[in-house]
Amino acid sequence: MLRLGSHVSMSGKKMLLGASEEAASYGSNTFMIYTGAPQNTRRKPIEELNIEAGLEHMKAHDMADIVVHAPYIINIGNSVKPETFELGVNFLQSEIERTRALGAKQIVLHPGAHVGEGADKGIKQIIQGLNEALIHDQDVQIALETMAGKGSECGRTFEELAQIIDGVTHNELLSVTFDTCHTHDAGYDIVNDFDGVLNEFDKIIGIDRLKVLHINDSKNERGAHKDRHANIGFGHIGFDALHYIVHHPQLSNIPKILETPYVGEDKASKKAPYKWEIAMLRNGEFDPDLLNKIQNS
């Protein structure tokens, strides 16, 4: 079954229930959430996440395979500042607990940045951090994300991700999130040769580790190492390639999550594009006037 959804907000009093309601309003049957603001460590206690009501709504609306995203502030690749590394390890452990409580099996993590110390040193630090953070009997996997290679990001090639996975003791607890924008921006030709890229992924990492797909178009040309998401069909990847990936038979059981930009001239009038983009990806017809329609809706 095609599991297609988007990033939604989990906030206010409704928390998980509100996230599921937002996802349902877009015609989604899965979704991704942050457990709080991605740029800080302020979090509500688990008992205030409104989990029971959220799970009931999810069941009634056929929501499944939901995904949690770890916050950006976690950087277990930092070997320069021990306090940043320790914060990352400790906060990752508490995020895993929240993920489990929410009933999710995957928590997406940007592997980390080496902050000028070089990829090898960054990767060693990430391995150390994951070895500290992972508890062997946990039932949540950390889904390491394919990165664009912006700045000092680690995980910009399949080889770098494989290096991290191979170094972690309990690597059965590691999976991978394949982000179409990041992978394109890292230099992989997912537009003309997605099957070739997928075969390469399978040889280097193993397709069985692929557990989450982030479906985003890109504002930049292939290999730009920028990581700037575009709306579906309005970037350098294009609708046909993204539709092909979403409906790829080898990826049929993997949740597909949109993280495309809100549409509008200014912050106050921006609108979520997900209802329209999900419908387009399901029915297979690109609407070149979509952005105007969203703005005028």
Swiss-Prot record:
Species of the source: Listeria innocua serovar 6a (strain ATCC BAA-680 / CLIP 11262)
Residues reported in the UniProt entry to bind Zn(2+) 1: H69, H110, E145
Cofactor note: Binds 3 Zn(2+) ions.
Residues the entry annotates as binding Zn(2+) 2: E145, D179, H214, E259
GO molecular function, one term: zinc ion binding
Protein name: Probable endonuclease 4
Catalytic activity line of the entry: Endonucleolytic cleavage to 5'-phosphooligonucleotide end-products
Entry EC number(s): 3.1.21.2
Entries under Gene3D superfamilies matching the protein: Divalent-metal-dependent TIM barrel enzymes
Cofactor: Zn(2+)
Ranges annotated as spanning the membrane: none
Any single GO BP term: base-excision repair
PROSITE patterns per record: AP_NUCLEASE_F2_1 (PS00729), AP_NUCLEASE_F2_2 (PS00730), AP_NUCLEASE_F2_3 (PS00731), AP_NUCLEASE_F2_4 (PS51432)
